[in-house]
Design a protein with these regions (language model features):
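Active-site residues of response regulator receiver
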Residues: 52
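Conserved acidic carboxylate
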Residues: 9
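Acidic catalytic/metal-coordinating carboxylates
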Residues: 33-36, 59-62
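Two-component/phosphorelay signaling modules centered on CheY-like receiver
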Residues: 12-29
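C-terminal output helix
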Residues: 98-120
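Conserved phosphotransfer cores of two-component systems
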Residues: 42-44, 66-74, 83-85
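Receiver (REC) domain active-site loop signature in two-component systems and cognate sites
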Residues: 55
């Protein structure tokens, strides 16, 4: 059974690129803002959320707080072009500018219970 990923990203081109990098290995659900991400998370309970931070309607950091407020064990990887720390967001961070192998490795690492990204909180 494929792992289910929720990809929250407001830039359509990046959604297409992420889908290409992930290939057919995962079931991918998309959200284009933080509010949609929370709704999709509540509906589908994905194995991992890949969350952009700067999005319309509701920011990714607000969506992260809302999801973790319901399920503190939810697996979320912040994917951002901005310099946020894992301590600020409460989840591991993968800074945009990564290559396909780094992206897939971060996803696999998170799915297997390890912190991923360029910096991560000690709790992960």
């Amino acid at each position: 059974m494929k792992k289910r990923l929720l990809v929250a990203e407001d830039e359509h081109d990046l959604l297409v690129i992420y889908r290409m990098m992930l290939g057919d290995a995962y079931e991918v659900i998309e959200a284009q803002n933080g509010r949609e991400a929370v709704e999709m998370w509540n509906q589908f309970h994905p194995d991992l959320v890949l969350m952009d931070i700067q999005m319309p309607v509701m920011s990714g950091d607000a969506a992260i707080r809302e999801i973790l407020g319901v399920d503190p064990l939810a697996k979320i990887l912040a994917v951002t072009a901005y310099r946020y720390s894992a301590e600020q967001l409460g989840v591991p961070v993968l800074n945009k500018g990564f290559g396909p192998s780094e992206f897939v490795a971060a996803v696999e690492s998170m799915l297997h219970g390890h912190a991923a990204g360029s910096n991560h909180p000690a709790a992960c």
